[in-house]
């Protein structure tokens, strides 16, 4: 039954590239076959509960601009919000959604009440999932908004806060498992520091390492089959976060024996904040064997902060999905729209239009990426560039068959005098432009 929030808007359908209907897909056709698989199954779209249904439209200079009938801290309002959310998922035809605990339940007076509220709303979600077929891509705990976490959760100097956060994560993993979630995400928004003057860096890293190990231990104890994901971000809200980027997260995982247990959820906007491109973070995660999922959005390139806008750069999406496809595609992960409306976009249909545009952009990027994979447009030149490493002597250098002395002897015997070869960057950039 309709909540009435979206009026008489019907389910969004694919109408093709020539359509001018703002409430239709021009490029996202869920049943279109791409590289032998349905487009929907490649992209695995998810809606972010927090930005879509919780964010009030405020900024540092002004408060709420969105007026939503569920903006009350009561269970009835939480259930209304859920009803609208699942109606939204059905209108868009997305297969997944994601949430933090604080997005979906009213704030209780204590841990027990928070848990009770979460369990009650999970009951409601389970009914909605059964009725609609929409699934949970991942769940997570909000360990950054409440003032108790102002000094961090896992890295807090107060062990009581560590314990409260750990217990909260347990309840959220339980909720995620009950709802059939395919991943569980950890994002350390307050796991970092504002100043080293009051920070014991080694202690905080050790605390964080133990915290993540506790999560992994509990995952195995209860038989949770999903992936544990860490979402890197360099700063904001803290000045420096310990999950700065993919490379930093991998070093952390190696130090605490977690590199085979935890993967990464990479957000485009966070990559930009860290001084990287989105494709850099994806390529590195693939190279290190820790790629899990993506949060899709974009930042304003002039602002210098995390603006969480819907994606609209097709060439960037094409390169991103080229790395996803080259790594074998999503296993348990997907494309979560961690994006929010601009604060002046106050109409209900704006929520749909923002997601429609993002989904179309990703679909165009995926199709371009798939064609590049089929044609070996990028992998072919790459293989040729590194072909010299296929000769026996080169292989021996890498596999330990040559010492430095033996390498020197080979250089002398073969009278090696290597000459530089073009990297052909401009050619490859032009190749990409042919596909997008």
Swiss-Prot record:
Q: Which cofactor does it need?
A: Mg(2+)
Chief location:
cytoplasm
Enzyme kind, highest EC tier = isomerase
Q: Name one GO biological process term.
A: D-xylose metabolic process
Fetch the Gene3D superfamilies from UniProt.
Divalent-metal-dependent TIM barrel enzymes
Q: How is the cofactor bound?
A: Binds 2 magnesium ions per subunit.
Q: Which domain of life is it from?
A: Bacteria
InterPro entries, alphabetized? Xyl_isomerase-like_sf (IPR036237), Xylose_isom_bac (IPR013452), Xylose_isomerase (IPR001998)
Q: Enumerate the UniProt keywords alphabetically.
A: Carbohydrate metabolism, Cytoplasm, Isomerase, Magnesium, Metal-binding, Xylose metabolism
Binding positions (Mg(2+)): 306, 308
User: Which EC number applies?
Assistant: 5.3.1.5
Location of the protein in the cell: Cytoplasm
Family recorded in the similarity comment: Belongs to the xylose isomerase family.
Quaternary state and partners of this protein?
A: Homotetramer.
Q: What is this protein called?
A: Xylose isomerase
The organism named in the record is Sinorhizobium fredii (strain NBRC 101917 / NGR234)
Name of encoding gene: xylA
């Amino acid at each position: 039954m309709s909540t009435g929030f979206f009026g008489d808007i019907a389910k969004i359908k694919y109408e093709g590239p020539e359509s001018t209907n703002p409430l239709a897909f021009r490029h996202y056709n869920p049943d279109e076959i791409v590289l032998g698989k349905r487009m929907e199954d490649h992209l695995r779209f998810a809606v972010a509960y927090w930005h879509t249904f919780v964010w009030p439209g405020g900024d540092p200079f002004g408060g709420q601009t969105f007026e939503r009938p569920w903006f009350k801290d009561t269970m009835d309002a939480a259930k209304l919000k859920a009803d609208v959310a699942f109606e939204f998922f059905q209108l868009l035809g997305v297969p997944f959604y994601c949430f933090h605990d604080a997005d979906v339940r009213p704030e209780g007076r204590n841990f027990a009440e928070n848990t009770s509220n979460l369990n009650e709303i999970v009951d409601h979600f389970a009914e909605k999932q059964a009725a609609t077929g929409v699934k949970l891509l991942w769940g997570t705990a909000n360990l950054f908004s409440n003032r108790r976490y102002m000094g961090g959760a896992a890295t807090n100097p107060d062990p009581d806060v560590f314990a409260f956060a750990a217990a909260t994560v347990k309840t959220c993993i339980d909720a995620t498992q009950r709802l059939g979630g395919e991943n569980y995400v950890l994002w350390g928004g307050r796991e970092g520091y504002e100043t080293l003057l009051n920070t014991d860096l080694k202690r905080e890293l050790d605390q964080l390492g133990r915290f993540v190990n506790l999560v992994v231990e509990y995952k195995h104890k209860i038989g949770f089959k999903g992936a544990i994901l860490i979402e890197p971000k360099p700063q904001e809200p803290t000045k420096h976060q310990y999950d700065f980027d993919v490379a930093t997260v991998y070093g952390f995982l190696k130090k605490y024996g977690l590199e085979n247990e935890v993967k990464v959820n990479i957000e485009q906007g966070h990559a930009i904040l860290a001084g990287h491109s989105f494709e850099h973070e994806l390529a590195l995660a693939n190279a290190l064997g820790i790629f899990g999922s993506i949060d899709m959005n974009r930042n304003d390139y002039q602002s210098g902060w995390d603006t969480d806008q819907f994606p609209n750069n097709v060439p960037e999406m094409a390169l991103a999905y080229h790395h996803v496809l080259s790594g074998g595609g999503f296993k348990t992960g997907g494309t979560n729209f961690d994006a929010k409306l601009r604060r002046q976009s106050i109409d209900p249909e704006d929520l749909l239009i923002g997601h429609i545009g993002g989904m179309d952009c990703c679909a165009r990027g995926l199709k371009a990426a798939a064609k590049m994979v089929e044609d070996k447009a990028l992998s072919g030149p790459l293989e040729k560039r590194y072909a010299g490493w296929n000769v026996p002597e080169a292989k021996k250098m890498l596999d330990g068959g040559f010492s430095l002395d033996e390498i020197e002897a080979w250089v002398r015997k073969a009278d090696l005098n290597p000459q530089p070869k073009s990297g052909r960057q401009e050619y490859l950039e032009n190749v990409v432009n042919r596909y997008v």
